[in-house]
Amino acid sequence: MQQTSDGVNNSRELPKSIIIPPIRGEMAKLRPATCDDLQRMDELCAFDKASVITGKDSQSERAMVHAWVERSVQWSHDGFSDSKLSELCRFAGDVQSRPTIAWAIVPDMLDDVENTFGAIIGMIFLIDIDGWSRSARIQVVLGKDYRGRGYSRDAMPRVMTYGFASEPAGLGLHRIWVGVPATNTRSLSVYQSLGFMKTGTARDVLWDAQNQKYQDFVVMDTLVDEYDAIRSLDAFGLHVIEENPGVVEALSAHEHSVAIPVRRDNLDDAWPYNTSTAEGTSSKRAWWRIIGRGRKRNVNTEGKQ
């Protein structure tokens, strides 16, 4: 692994194989997805109205999810051969061949009943993982009856924390991005609250079969030095779970490790997952408006950025 003096990973290569960590949320836990979970996704009608949510038709969305899970299983079980890994790095522009990590979302409660059988309600992915640019796309696919209940808000910042954490705690990503139809205002609002910034719009690249018209595709992203794991959770009144992968590194990198003990005395005793969490109070400040102000940028001789 090649690193700079400040500890940044300069390697442009992905590992041959990976151990996908479980991740704990407040509403659900995330475990590595398996091919056996795919039938459940059909039962959940997880691909219903896909054109409205992701801009793809249901069959295309289903095929992509199957491919993502299969690639995730391969990377975490058999791994990639030297020749395959070299090909992935050399032809990073081929998004269809890039590695993927897939988690199944397992809620604590299922329809107000304890989920003793571990039934899943959807999946969350890091896809298009590009070792050369240290970039990945995040995607959530939920069952029809479990959308809009807060599962994406609970899972996404925790997966992003793992993605941005330096290796070996995380993937050492530099950029995480999302893509969504311009008409999906609910998702756009969630992504903005997580700190994503709109970086571009591809006009009329998606076909809305339901309304029989073209629609725009909005790209949003956030960078490792912009993303704040603590504030992204606080924006939704969620707790930090320090046992999750990448959290300790995130606290250290963003200088929250000192603030956490100060606030510890005021924690709700009912919170069971760790003893060093931040309070679950909603953020009152639109913090995403100030992200990136402290980033280092090149300055020309006239002092203009």
Which positions does each model-derived feature cover?
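GNAT-family acyltransferases
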Residues: 1-145, 213-305
